[in-house]
Every structure is written in structure tokens, then in C-alpha cells.
Amino acid sequence: IFSFRKETDGDFRDSRYQHNIKIIRVEDNGDVDFVLYGYMNRGVREGYCGVCVYHYSNDQNVVEEKVFIPSTESYEFLKEDLGTLSYVSTENALYLLFANKLYKINISDGTSEVLEEGIKKDDFAVSDTGAHAAWIIQEGESAGNIKEIDFETLETRSLAPSSGQSLVLNGFMNEDLVYGIVVDGD
């Protein structure tokens, strides 16, 4: 569906492989939504590094850019980040974690927003289906709390430790959040 390579008259840009594609949804009619991430070899984004969301229309045989989010992260870091979370909700919203930020991207209209910043990948977990995520808040009044989100409803809940305790995020079992309570000094 997509390539930076030219069939004829290729040049040095054809041999730069610091990008990849992640398919995020395939519909029954053959339409495909995918994310291109890393270094952009050609086109209007040539020379930039980032994440680009595309929609391929099978009926029209056309690839349309929906949104581009530039990044200073290298291809290797983007690849690792996008392996952590890339979930499409029933409302056609794509949720991505990269560059320590949780993004919501509306695939239909191409808008994007940052839902949360300062998320450490090591303190972030995603459920089996990708519909839920949780992370430990790093800064501010809520530092040390666990925040959980449901990507279908955007409902969140916050778990706070009692005095003299801290929380450890263990991950998910299916769609259920698993965390531990540690008594300070243990």
C-alpha cells in the first residue's frame, strides 16, 4: 500500500530504512489504517522524523495522510514506543504512546491531542486488548498514584497509596489492572 521507494530513477533515499509501518486496522471493505513512523524519506515530510497516520481507501486506491506528529526521537525509540500502545477505539480514535506522551488521534478528522505527559515507559502498562492502560504519575500532587484509563469511554480512575505506603504497577491480567501495595521500609 505504501513505500518510499521509486520504481524507476531511484536515488540514495531508497536505501534509507529508518522507518517502518504498523497496521492498526483493516476493514471488511479493504480499507486500511496504518502508522508510518521514523525518518520520512520523501514527500512533504521529507527530512522529518515522527509519526504519520494514514488511511488507505480500497475503493479509490488512494493513501491519505490524516495527521503527522513530529518527533525528536530516533527511529529505534519510536519503534519501541509504538510497540507499547497503538489502539483504535470504536469511535475511530487512535491512542499512541510515544516520547513520554499519551496521544489521542481522531482518524476521521486528523486532529490530535496529548492526553498525558511525563509517562515513563517502564511505569506504563496496557491490557491484553489495548482498551485499557495505566501508569504511575511521576510529578505533582498526584505523584506516586496510579492512573487508569478506558480508551472506549475515556473514563479514568486514580489509585492513591495510604500514608506510609507506595504503589507498584504490575500490569494487566486480561482487562483487569494488577498492582501491589508496598509498605515503606519493606
Model-derived regions, located:
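Short beta-strand elements that form the blades of beta-propeller/WD-repeat-like
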Residues: 1, 22-55, 83-98, 130-140, ...
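Repeated scaffold domains used in trafficking and secretory/extracellular systems
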Residues: 11-26, 71-87, 117-129, 163-176
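Surface-exposed loop/turn elements that mediate protein-protein interactions on large endomembrane-trafficking
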Residues: 1-17, 43-78, 97-117, 141-163, ...
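Long amphipathic alpha-helical scaffold regions
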Residues: 119-182
